[in-house]
């Protein structure tokens, strides 16, 4: 399950940079959510 990624995907679908930030911060937030 990836609630954070799933919600961020449609919102930042046009912002690839934001997605990278989510991945980097995801490691600090929830590695399982980002990796999943």
UniProtKB/Swiss-Prot annotation:
The gene is MFA1. This is Mating hormone A-factor 1. It comes from Saccharomyces cerevisiae (strain ATCC 204508 / S288c). A lipid is attached at residue 33 (S-farnesyl cysteine). It is a lipid-anchor. One of its GO terms (cellular component) is extracellular region. It is found in: Cell membrane. Keywords: Cell membrane, Lipoprotein, Membrane, Methylation, Pheromone, Prenylation. Its main location: membrane. Coiled coil: none annotated. InterPro entries: Mfa1/2. GO terms for biological process: pheromone-dependent signal transduction involved in conjugation with cellular fusion.
